[in-house]
Amino acid sequence: MGVKLEVFRMTIYLTFPVAMFWIANQAEWFEDYVIQRKRELWPPEKEDQPQELEDFKERIRKQREERLLRAAQQSS
């Protein structure tokens, strides 16, 4: 009984990881679950999003220049 049980346990220990790797590496499964989930979490950028970022950078740059100009005028 003990030897048969050990052989059964060893078979399960070896079969389970191999089966999980085989299932997880299926291309259809990967596309359906992983890629789709990634698209849900991080949707593609909108067309106007990069422009908004550039506008924000420009506003910050102008504010910084104005601050430096005021500081230079006050110190002289």
From Swiss-Prot:
Q: Main location per UniProt?
A: membrane
> What GO terms are given for molecular function?
unfolded protein binding
Where do transmembrane segments lie in this chain?
7-24
Name the GO cellular-component terms.
mitochondrial inner membrane
Q: How does it sit in the membrane?
A: Single-pass membrane protein
Listed under GO biological process in this entry are: mitochondrial cytochrome c oxidase assembly
Q: Where in the cell is it found?
A: Membrane; Mitochondrion; Mitochondrion inner membrane
Keyword annotations of the record:
Membrane, Mitochondrion, Mitochondrion inner membrane, Transit peptide, Transmembrane, Transmembrane helix
- Which function does this protein serve? Plays a role in mitochondrial complex IV assembly.
Q: How does it assemble?
A: Interacts with COX7A2.
Protein family according to the UniProt entry: Belongs to the PET100 family.
Q: What is this protein called?
A: Protein PET100 homolog, mitochondrial
Q: Which organism is it from?
A: Sus scrofa
Annotated gene? PET100
